[in-house]
């Protein structure tokens, strides 16, 4: 983690002092930095949720045998818990627009399965809007076997979306989409940290 921070600082300083040539637009470099930052924050979000789950008595596992035989547990999407295996073992489709997109966590509470995507955002913008769209898309997904989807958004932008204030047309549109898809898919959830804690408490 510290190595990543140092590399990011070095990269920013390097490009700040150097005029890029026409073959390397500065926007591309910033996009790469933003993507790496988003991935880092996403992983922090995953770890935060796993920590909350563990406090409520859920166990984290790394293989299918333990996951399938335990009532309250969580796993992260990984090589063992890839899309193919998850679809086969849980009987789900996970039909996102982006083909073969994996989510972040699989939560099991007895016979209930919840598939979770976690993001951390503080501001809006091009890359951030794309991540919000991905979270909203998760709410549209449905499964015949009652599996639920969780869109978890942490950070200042989550508070803006969940508030009653205006904040402009874009925010209002995003709120309307969230409400619409939650109404269409009542088994799904859009939560911040407090909402996630409440949901997990109810599952126990």
Please give the residue ranges for each predicted region:
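Secondary-structure boundary elements
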Residues: 51-62, 109-112, 145
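Active-site beta-strand-loop-beta-strand hairpin of nuclease catalytic cores
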Residues: 98-115
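Short amphipathic alpha-helical segments and helix-helix/interface helices
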Residues: 50, 136-140, 178-179
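Domain-level recognition of nuclease-like catalytic cores that cleave nucleotide substrates
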Residues: 151-204
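Catalytic cores of nucleic-acid endonucleases
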Residues: 120-170
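A short acidic/basic microdomain associated with nuclease active sites
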Residues: 35, 39, 55-97
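Nuclease-adjacent, charged terminal/linker segments that flank catalytic cores
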Residues: 1-48
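Flexible secondary-structure boundary motifs
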Residues: 82-86, 113, 117-118
């Amino acid at each position: 983690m510290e190595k990543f921070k140092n590399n990011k600082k070095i990269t920013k300083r390097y490009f700040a002092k150097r005029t890029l040539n026409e073959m390397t637009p500065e926007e591309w470099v910033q996009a790469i930095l933003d993507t790496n930052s988003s991935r880092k924050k996403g992983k922090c979000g995953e770890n935060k949720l796993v920590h909350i789950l563990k406090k409520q008595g859920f166990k984290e596992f790394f293989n299918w045998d333990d996951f399938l035989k335990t009532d309250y547990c969580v796993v992260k999407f990984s090589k063992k818990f890839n899309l193919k295996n998850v679809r086969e073992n849980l009987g789900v489709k996970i039909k996102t627009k982006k083909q073969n997109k994996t989510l972040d966590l699989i939560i099991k509470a007895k016979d209930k399965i919840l598939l979770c995507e976690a993001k951390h955002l503080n501001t809006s913008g091009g890359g951030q809007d794309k991540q919000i769209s991905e979270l909203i898309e998760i709410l549209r997904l449905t499964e015949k076997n009652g599996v639920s989807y969780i869109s978890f958004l942490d950070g200042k932008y989550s508070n803006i979306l969940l508030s009653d204030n205006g904040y402009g047309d874009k925010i209002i549109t995003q709120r309307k989409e969230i409400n619409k898809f939650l109404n269409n898919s009542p088994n799904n959830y859009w939560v911040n940290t407090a909402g996630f804690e409440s949901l997990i408490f109810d599952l126990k």
